[in-house]
């Protein structure tokens, strides 16, 4: 391992020890903000410090074991142990490289998840409902909490659009690569000829930003409309104008929220979603991504805009970004999607490592 990396790891280890001492001081314990910040930093360093300690132990173990090579009775055992330790060192170094990659500060935040039906009519709406159920089951398995902010139900079941907030540790980091076009191929229940139909939905995932990181929004840039909350088929579910629609005039971004009975609560939630969308758009613009960030995140709902295909006749799910196919569609639709999410995260980390190698 490079001397510069070892030096960085040593400084992180020292910082970890310093934080451990600070967290025991009464002045820090009595300052909630400071205690929370130090605790978070301490927890973030935990994995890299443990892995570095393991790496050090393995190197020391090799040095000690090499002393046994001159002993005929111990030589074979020593050679085997050295070989095993070298393999473990290689694994530890790979893990340390990943742990040292620049962290996306948004990864630890809650996330807004938006699912929108695209091409395919009623079947696209039904599939949007299936995706919502899939993500809800996944969230349940992670002990995350799902809060529906706005749901525009489809007459045949499912949703034209649904926006939810997923609360939990590291939600955005796990779900952010779900943004994009999701395509389904199956025979609809209403199809009498048994023909396979293709429909599409789009998914957008955005971090819920803390108040101090939210972009400033000029109230004069907003148009706020109120209306009555409605259920499926346009039926009114209450008699007051509690639902809120906010339009950000400069960007044209529109957010609706009708989950709460209180207009003030719906407005607060809608403003939070709006702030996240504006921040996401600005982040993408600064990164010189597509100018139309909302379109980039949500896609157009067109069949060609796809990251993943769910093929029911063949019982398979294919992620087109990394050419990954799994033949456990039923399990996936029941929320077992780690085997789809983790390979994407691993691929992203590999890309980051390659980029760092090129820079070095």
UniProtKB/Swiss-Prot annotation:
Entry-linked InterPro entries: PCRF, Pep_chain_release_fac_I, Pep_chain_release_fac_I_sf, Prokaryotic/Mito_RF, RF-1
N5-methylglutamine modification, residue list: 235
A GO CC term assigned to this protein in UniProt: cytoplasm
Keywords tagged on the record: Cytoplasm, Methylation, Protein biosynthesis
Keyword Aminoacyl-tRNA synthetase: no
Record PTM text: Methylated by PrmC. Methylation increases the termination efficiency of RF1.
Ranges for region Disordered: 286-311
Transmembrane intervals: none
Biological role: Peptide chain release factor 1 directs the termination of translation in response to the peptide chain termination codons UAG and UAA.
Family: Belongs to the prokaryotic/mitochondrial release factor family.
Name of this chain's protein: Peptide chain release factor 1
